[in-house]
Amino acid sequence: AEGAVTKVAGVSKQDGVKNVFVRGLGDRYNATTFNGFAVPSEDPEYKNISLDFFGTDIIQSVGVNKAFNAGGISDVGGATIDIVSKELIGSGNLNIGLSGGLNTQTVTADFLKQDGVNLLGFATTTEPADENNWGFKNKLDPSKQSLQINRSYSISGGKRFHIGKDRNPLSFFLTAGHTTDYQFTDETIRNTTTSGTIYKDMTGKKYTENISQLALANVDYDMQNRHHMSYNFMMIHANVQSVGDYTGKNSIFSDDYDNQGFTRRQQANDNLLIVNQLMTNWGLTKTLSLDAGASYNIVKGNEPDRRINNITKAEEGYTLLRGNSQQRYFSTLDEDDINVKAGLIYRLKDNVEEISNIRLGYTG
């Protein structure tokens, strides 16, 4: 979906930025819908869902609307991007996909992974129950991995049936996928005061692993070629875990050795998005129809056991800092979202090639 959207005039993608820009306007000025319903981001830090999840085996079409319309979302200054999920075409199919990749420069290099995240990317979120004991489930030291292979698996398929004497078509379509990829970066972190004084100047290495799963299901039922009902389900699980080791100057370190020290930051963001949609279309007459539907979305964002350790340079090597310089932090976010829409549509002409109509309805 992202590749298709960026080919539209006025839409661009910047390296290192998660979402697209429309006429120079970023995430907060755009909106994303899924089958016409507003859909939240899988990442609580963003307003719009990442288009990276939507490959050609998942979407039927994607549209970009840069002009205001009465049925659209109001808080949009750039564009509304509507993703239409895939439905079964034909009587049935089955597809299986497998891909892999590696970086020959780093494939056998030591890669640091934090403790507490399993192979599927689900993190251990258990907090210490006893504040006097602080029995953490996760180890403080990261582990080392010596073989990094990017990999992706997918499967999709569906089947069509005919129900009753009218042979009304009932179709099912399901797709699921898993992706794991690794990133290794050299980083430089510098901070200054408003007067230009440098109080932080550190360099280091960051090891990042991205694990995600996506599942999408669609059920369609047509009744007498006049009424249509469909249910869509989508689940996105995304885990980003990283370990960063940095050395250099930081004002929190002891000034006896020019504020030199070492920082290790271990962080995992474990996010889950679940989308449920029910859509109906009722042909009341040849020229009048009723569209009605509802969606229920669930977002869960976890940042379990973020670990930050700082040690300062000293005469005997490195020592722990005093005060609140060490950190183990837990955060959770749970949000439910309900959207409904209904509208009466009157076709001005009873002609297949004539699409002019009048619509009166509600979306919210």
Regions from the language model: what does each represent?
Residues L112-V117, D186-T197, D245-D258, R307-E316:
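Flexible, surface-exposed loop regions and adjacent strand-edge segments
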Residues K66, S85, K159-F161, D220-M223, ...:
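Residue-level signature of outer-membrane beta-barrel architecture
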Residues L140-S143, I198-K205, N259-Q266, V275, ...:
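Extracellular loop and loop/strand-boundary signature of outer-membrane beta-barrel proteins
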Residues L94-L98, L170-A176, M229-Y231, L290-A294, ...:
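Transmembrane beta-strands of outer-membrane beta-barrel proteins
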Residues N138-D245, I274-N276:
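Transmembrane beta-barrel wall of Gram-negative outer-membrane proteins
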Residues L88-N93, H162-S171, N225-R226, T285-S289, ...:
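Short loop/turn motifs that connect adjacent beta-strands in outer-membrane beta-barrel proteins
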Residues A1-F21, L25-D27, G36-A70, G77:
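Periplasmic N-terminal accessory/gating domains of Gram-negative outer-membrane beta-barrel systems
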Residues G100-T104, A176-Y182, M235-N239, Y296-N302, ...:
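Transmembrane beta-strands of outer-membrane beta-barrel pores
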